[in-house]
Amino acid sequence: KKVTAVDTKGKRYRIQERLRDLENILPSYFIRINKSTLANEHRIERFVAVFNGGVDAVFRCGYREYVSRRCFSQIRRRYEGI
């Protein structure tokens, strides 16, 4: 079974839940940003374009993570209604 790492407030946990299952359990402010990452949207400071035409999510702590094109288009649609 696949192991998932969870980073929270500087601590790392390993759990055996699949991301798909976590996505259904976690509150709606946890969003998928790529195939292997769920992120708390409240901790994302901004999205930035990168040299290859892609997008990175920049977190308040300074960490950066690649955002897939598919996920970014879903994130944009989510905020277009606001």
Feature names for model-found ranges:
Residues 1-82:
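Basic, polyanion-interacting recognition surfaces, primarily
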